[in-house]
Amino acid sequence: MTCRDMAQKNATFGWRSFVARVSYSRVWQWFILQDRECRLLYMIMDLTRRQRRQAWRLLLASLAVLGIGLVPLLSQQALYLDDMSRTLDGYFGWGLNARPAAEGVMRLLGFGGELVNVAPLPQLAAWGIAAGMALVWWRRVPGLSPGVCVLGNALIWLTPFTLQNFSYAYDSLPMSLGLASAMLASLILRPGVHGPVQRSQRRWQPSLMALGLLLLALCCYQPALNVFLVLSLLDALMGSRPRGVERREAEERNTEERKFEEGKTEQSESVWCAWLALLQRGGLVLAALLLYLPLSRLLVAGDYSQQHGEMLSLGDLPALLAALEQHLAQALAALRGGLDLVSGALSGSLLVVALGAALMTAGRRHDARQVSSRQLTLERLSRLLWALLLIPALWGPMLMLAEPVFHSRTLVGWGALLGGALMLSLAGRQARGSERFTLRRCLLGVAALLLLRHWLIFAAWSNALAAQQAHETQLAREIVTQARELGLPITSPRDRDTYRPHDELAVQVLGKAPLAPLARVAERQVPAVRQNLIAAFTPDNYWAVVRLRMAGASAATLLRDDERKASIKEPPVCDERATVDAPGDEGGSPRIFTQTLREGVWVIDFRTAENCRRADVRP
């Protein structure tokens, strides 16, 4: 049987039809029908079948590795911060924060014009997107083994700074979609596996696709752009080689069999080409921002979004540099505040080994006969500059805001730095050489220990979040029950357009409610939990009002009048003549709060008598 007969026969077997068409139109035209070519066709078909099995195994392994960290969080089914207010009122609200793609995605999952609680489906979809990116890394970065892809991809998504991102029952999907879009934009521009169809495409098509993905990332979640910046710098840092070494290696791999095995074509990876690639990516980022900023100005609404969306003035250069220095110091403090000693040491070790190897490689892969000293100096200085630029790239354009908010959820570039450094340092022909076998084992060992630490952090966060949510829910019910006994007007119909009650009852919280007993140890010992565990019942906290509304106080609103706030604090609420104590527990111990209606304001006081006495003696 000839190759042409086999191609026609296999055309009826579903997934083999593509291979059959290729063999009929390409292979049969290029080769003479001999037994050697028949064996080549069988090898291509077997390779396709093997790759499909390997891809399924990689996807299942990625789902399992990510699931170890995400399943405990998803099983809690706790509404986190914005989820509570969105569930109560049924509003979307992402468009007001200049995230139209996020709102569009969630409206596709909704029922009409109001948001319906479909949790945990958005979180499950985010889990699937995160796992699927391991396949993209495997296909776009030649030389990566499936195990390294699974491990590196897990380090990208499971970090102490993505706890909030996956905790949101709704926002987890747009955030994950934005991160995946930014990563895909970087990988599309990276030289990877190119087939005959891809080689015939025009050069501008990858850039146009990357620009669209960057715009999608900005419209889903603005900090996702930082992932693209970090991966671009890592690609330049770990992918550039001197022209002499590049030319010699190209001559060594000049046979068709070696090209087929490597799965890529030879392309220039010199320092100059790396600089040109960085300039190209910088131009794409600038173009995406120029397209996005006018859109954001049209969509942004609300005091909070407008306040934190203003840019620094570019007219005063000294003031601009001082503001950038201050913002960078605040960002680094937020970074240190989310890392415990073990995770910080492991992360630092991984980055030092991976980036250090990239910086040291320039002087060890060649000798002076192959590359001039000027090229060596240029390469070393370029690599050092790229490594230093990784620090501001973690926050990207956020540093240019007048009042940036460095929440932990915005530091999504940290995972891209860890996972990208691991995978790009182990990718390629050089990383598989025997001279770097020790480095490979060291990187994989540190990365595995770091992933184990991140699993523990996710487990601690999941349990602490569940305990705190249950504690605040019970506390809100007790407050509302006592308010009804006191005859406070806590219920009122709400307007469906403005989401405000017809008869408002302003709420002022004094003091701070204690944390849940089951969450106190985790809050003390795990910095990531302490950074993300937000107590609702604190002064001037909107989430306290949301908690009370969930317990049945539909008339509650947050008191925003500063003069009324100052008048309510004097005399102290802990004065027995001005408050009504809550009934005690069964054991006879008093409750932790008191409440009263003062000047038309619902005052809830968590201050103890000891704190009030201390406040009285202060000057």
Role assignments for model-derived ranges:
Residues 14, 18, 22-68:
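Start-transfer (signal-anchor) and selected internal transmembrane alpha helices
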Residues 31, 35-52, 194-202, 241-277, ...:
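Membrane-interfacial, low-structure loops and terminal tails that flank and connect transmembrane helices
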Residues 44-96, 100, 106, 110-150, ...:
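Intrinsically disordered, polar/acidic, low-complexity terminal segments
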Residues 67-124, 130, 151-153, 169, ...:
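Transmembrane catalytic cores of multi-pass membrane glycosyltransferases
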Residues 136-141, 186-194, 233-242, 356-369, ...:
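Structural signal for the C-terminal ends of transmembrane alpha-helices
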Residues 152-160:
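Short helix- or helix-capping micro-motifs
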Residues 176-196, 209-213, 231-232, 236-238, ...:
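Specific aromatic-rich, kink-prone transmembrane helix
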Residues 427-457:
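Signature aromatic-anchored transmembrane alpha helix within multi-pass, membrane-resident enzymes
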